[in-house]
A protein has these predicted regions:
Chain A
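Phosphate- and other anionic-substrate recognition elements at nucleic-acid/protein interfaces
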Residues: 1-167
Length: 167, 167
């Protein structure tokens, strides 16, 4: 199965294309969609949507996995995160792809073994698990962790533990 | 000037196409984009985006005006509202249209004369101001109020009072 993992944020969205199953996986592509502050919010969201569409056209993933939002400092942040999350959801729906959401805490628990792992620990573990020759940027590592959790969830017991839901 | 006004929400997005200037306006089209609960969130957002694109293609507005989010009960609501707001922003940016945001309170103050006006009062006043033969659905009336405020804001003094900002 081929999965597109997304860790969305208005100015810095991590993405990853992973192929494999619940026991093994390899990274085909990963990176960070960076939008400079001079671009207004509407243009930034459109750019994330277009980038996601391009990734889907190029890599033809079977499904999409995205990080759920659990904790936010303020309503302002929540609104901005909700908007950033909408852009890849729209791109996925345009291609008729199903999107699954995972709690960031459960993804970290599954991948690093600790729900409170920090960004460096996730990047370090992802590098080891996928045999990458470099430590990935942390937003891309988060996207790979989500995609990896989604591949693990092809085992139904893991899907329950990971508390996944369709969005 | 022709303006597309949008009052976004995941399941019920009001829209309005108004033409005019700061002193007079008429409604060319208005309505509510309703998405049934059986459609997942990603499909709902995609549908709002596509509907907005269709409206832009049909009516060719010069600018887009959208309601800002001021008060929300919970982070969950804020995330959902942020997502709903992203869909028309993406559609507008795809056509290179500038989007202006207005505070709902200031729009009500400008149109009804009272920042705390309820939905019925807005719909009643919009019907009178635009000479409509029916009382519009409240979500459509909100979108017309935003579009009307935007036309008023073509007078720079009004733009300042309305506290508008580009998004």
């Amino acid at each position: 199965m081929r999965t597109l993992g997304i860790d969305p944020a208005i100015r810095s969205t991590g993405y990853a294309i992973l192929e494999g199953d619940h026991s093994s996986a390899r990274a085909l592509d990963y990176g960070v969609i960076t939008i400079p502050p001079r671009i207004p919010q509407s243009g930034a969201l459109e750019a994330i949507c277009t980038h996601t569409r391009n990734l889907i056209e190029k890599w033809k993933p079977d499904e999409v996995a995205i990080e759920g939002i659990i904790y936010v400092q303020s309503h302002r942040t929540a609104i901005s995160m909700g908007a950033a999350r909408a852009a890849p959801l729209i791109a996925a729906a345009q291609f008729g792809l199903t999107v699954y959401e995972y709690s960031p805490k459960k993804v970290k628990k599954a991948i690093v073994g600790k729900g409170t792992a920090d960004k460096n620990q996730v990047a370090f573990m992802i590098r080891a698990l996928l045999g990458l020759s470099e430590t990935p940027p942390s937003d891309a590592a988060d996207a790979m962790a989500i995609a990896l959790a989604h591949l693990q969830a092809s085992d139904p017991r893991r899907a329950t533990i990971l508390d996944r839901r369709k969005v």
